[in-house]
Amino acid sequence: MITDNANYLWVEKYRPQCIADCILPDHLKNTFQEIVGSGELQNLLLSGGPGCGKTTVAKALCNELNTDWIIINCSEDGNIDTLRTRIRQFASTISISGNNKAVILDEFDYANPQSMQPALRGFIEEFSKN
């Protein structure tokens, strides 16, 4: 696949691609580098104010661990239908490259607490091997 860097948003073009390039407090950077060193991405909840780097860290972890990922912005798609369709289609298949998969739920505080949040536990248990 050929990509044209001229069409990237500036923030995406220059987003750090690995944890070492992220500007983080030392204790957080060390924690994330330990995750990379373990070679296994666990379920994580990253919290903090807007613009502090949560999404960047999630993407950098996936990149360093050669993990295929999909990102869902819950402020736009935070409902049970998204879980049943887009996320299920992604998580239920095995990666062509043989990589593990990760689902990044951005702005999860906007997810519907009555439907999506309770269903997520069973979903994680069902597809944790992928």
What residues fall within each predicted segment?
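P-loop/Walker A NTP-binding region and its immediately flanking N-terminal helices
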Residues: 1-130
